[in-house]
């Protein structure tokens, strides 16, 4: 699992195609009792283990605040 503490901008020259997958989220408390956002994605049907958990990212409160600001700025 990845613990995301901050986000850094990276410009992409071009965006390639992506496959659609299932995604879930959970609101959990870390060991210090702070609320975190966890996002999990699950393997596409073409993978060796279809539907198995593929990626897991847990966002700290600081990363959540940064993500919120990015969304408000770019996706009004």
Which residue stretches match the model-derived regions?
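Positively charged, low-complexity terminal tracts
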Residues: 1-76
